Amino acid sequence: VLSARAHPSDLPVLRDETATDTAGSPVGAAVRRAPGADRVRLDRGVPPDLPLELVMELVGVFVGGLSGALAAIRKQFDIFGIVVLAWAAGLGGGLMRDVLIGAFPPVGIGRWEFILTACLAGVTMYFFHPRLERARRMIAVFDAGALALFTVVGTVKGLSLGAGPTASVCVGVITGVGGGVLRDLLTGEVPVVLHHRQLYAIPAVIGASCTVALWSTSSLSTLTVGLAVGLVLGLRLVAMRFHLNVPGPWRGGVRGG
């Protein structure tokens, strides 16, 4: 039996039945299972620790941090404010997710490599922002990838801790969009996901729902996780390429654009 590691941002891991608490009863080596979590097991297909996915998540944190730092620079923040906003944008979604599902310490304060990656993104933008600002389109593409990965990872983590299908979809979407929401709130803006009518949260909802469906049919594997990530990424990129927007409010028989 594989032993779980204290790794708040990983996909679900096997429970170590040999570990015991102070009363001598078996417990998970990393965290206690939530009620109902016994029916949610790793043998449904997700490997316990995939370095590639960890690397991809770190890349997502870095790119999210770049977007936060860029927003801070546009607001004329100092170096401290830039780094703080990079941390918020890169790790805000995971932080919200872990607080909601009771995974402590949250990834935003409990994993030094994630914190360092987000802060490094802030420092990088501080020194190189004239060049990086011209690469906004590329950053937007990477941000779409971060949205896709965080959504699927967040959904699987919710399922692994015993959350129901609806709750797990919500957890996945919050993980995907939470960093951007926190970034916008800290800069005094209405979150983009709420007012720009972009297809941003909708791809996350679709991807999280597909992940739950795969889990419930025992079809979740490394391949299908990758396909779910690709689905969210593809929908977001298509929306960006063809300027697909969510309809605005209905005004006197004319739909808002």
How would you describe each model-predicted region?
Residues 44-52, 99-109, 153-167, 213-224:
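Helix-coil boundary and interhelical linker segments in multi-pass alpha-helical membrane proteins
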Residues 101-109, 133-139, 158-168, 186-196, ...:
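A cytosolic-side transmembrane-helix exit/cap motif
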Residues 49-61, 106-120, 164-177:
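Structural signature of hydrophobic alpha-helical transmembrane segments
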Residues 54-67, 85-88, 207:
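The first (N-terminal) embedded transmembrane alpha-helix
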Residues 65-76, 98, 123-136, 181-193, ...:
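C-terminal ends of transmembrane helices
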Residues 84-88, 95-101, 170, 174, ...:
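Short, structured motif recognition centered on aromatic/hydrophobic residues
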Residues 86-94, 142-156, 198-212, 256-257:
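Small-residue-rich segments of transmembrane alpha-helices in multi-pass membrane proteins
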Residues 80-88, 111-115, 136-147, 171, ...:
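Cytoplasmic-side transmembrane-helix entry/capping segments in multi-pass membrane proteins
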